[in-house]
Each structure stands twice: as structure tokens, then as C-alpha cells.
A protein has these predicted regions:
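Active-site-adjacent pocket-lining segments in enzyme domains
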Residues: 1-127
């Protein structure tokens, strides 16, 4: 799931409501169905902040190193793991992969490194 303001405003109400946000019903249904089928999920940028609202159990996720946003996702029930722009955090048990992308990236090359790792890990978890 890509991040950016679209995830925070259109796929959820996170931008306006923070920890009290609602997640788009279709996104929530898709994510839950994929998880129940044992399929891996990849969320990037601010999109991982939606995961605690989608799932009723704690997940290991990252939004990078922004302490204010990390506090919000932990308040929502996630375990936030600080992560550099070029890396990923994997919740092995739940097959969820996250990367900070533009939460930290200053250019597309920086974002691409973490995103490419996310895609590779999601594909590996699919096998």
C-alpha cells in the first residue's frame, strides 16, 4: 500500500484524526482477507500507521524515525521500530513488511532503496 497524503487523507482519516482515525472499509476488508489467506502485505511511508486500525492485534511496523508519529502508532497498539529510509521492518509472524519511504526520503533514489527491499521481501514471503 503506498503512503503519502492520499493514505492519510483518502484511505483513512489519519491526517485529521490521528489515533482516532477510521480506515477505508475496502482497504480494511482487502488487508484482512489477504492476512487470513496467509498472503504478505507491504505498507510504505505513512500507510503503516493504518495497520493498528486494520488489525485487532499488535504488529511490528515502522514509519521511520519521526517520534511524534511513532508515539501515535504506539498509542494505537503497534510496536514501532525506528528504521532508516533504505531499510524495512518485517513482522515475520504476520507477514507484514513496512518501510519509511518519504517519511524520511529526500529524493526518489533514497525512497527506492527501501521500497525495492519491501517488494523483494513481500515476494519472498509469497513463495
Amino acid at each position: 500500500v503506498p503512503g503519502g497524503f492520499g493514505a492519510a487523507k483518502n484511505l483513512s482519516s489519519f491526517a485529521a484524526e490521528g489515533s482516532e482515525c477510521q480506515v477505508d472499509r475496502d482497504l480494511q476488508a482487502l488487508a484482512l482477507a489477504m492476512h487470513q489467506a496467509g498472503k504478505p502485505l507491504g505498507f510504505m511511508c505513512i500507510a503503516p500507521a493504518l495497520l493498528p486500525k486494520i488489525f485487532a492485534f499488535p504488529l511490528r511496523i515502522t514509519i521511520g524515525t519521526d517520534l511524534d508519529t511513532a508515539d501515535v502508532v504506539e498509542e494505537m497498539g503497534a510496536e514501532h521500530v525506528p528504521c532508516p529510509v533504505d531499510d524495512i521492518v518485517v513482522d515475520e509472524e504476520n507477514k507484514v513488511v513496512t518501510t519509511p519511504a518519504y517519511m524520511l526520503a529526500e529524493n526518489i533514489a533514497q525512497a527506492a532503496t527501501g521500497i525495492e527491499k519491501l517488494v523483494a521481501r513481500v515476494l519472498a514471503l509469497s513463495a
